[in-house]
Amino acid sequence: MPGKELVLIDTSVWIQADSLKANSEVKSKVLLLLDKDRAATCGIIIAELLCGAKTPTNYEELKIDIGGIHYLNTPEDVWLKAAQMSFDLRKKGISVPLTDILIACIAIDNNCSLLHLDKHFTCLASKTDLKIELFE
């Protein structure tokens, strides 16, 4: 994928983009990334999305929709990096949910930025190599 940087889209963005009250900027950004084939996901984000499905039909629709974008694997060393990052942050008095740390480590490992609506990622970006996409 030379020249095409992927953007890992966090669950917080997917939920907002799919909402009936969706922020038009959020929805537009997601649609642009999808259109340019730059949207990416990973296992933990898929699990979070599917856990939040409202009906069996919604679950199946989400599974099909999310299956059509780039999938970032989570090798064993990424789990270890997440554990180390969590340990290091806690030693500094910073507590971040492990799911968010894992998502950040997956983005870092794949050299892609993260599109989010979650304050934990803003904190992680200020303390780690995580690159985040901002809404204007």
Regions found by a protein language model. Give the residues of each.
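Histidine- and aromatic-rich ligand-binding microenvironments
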Residues: 10, 42, 95-97, 118, ...
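A generic structural signal for short hydrophobic patches within well-formed alpha-helices
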Residues: 14, 46-49, 121-122
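Acidic, PIN/NYN-like endoribonuclease modules and their adjacent C-terminal/linker elements
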Residues: 1-6, 104, 108-136
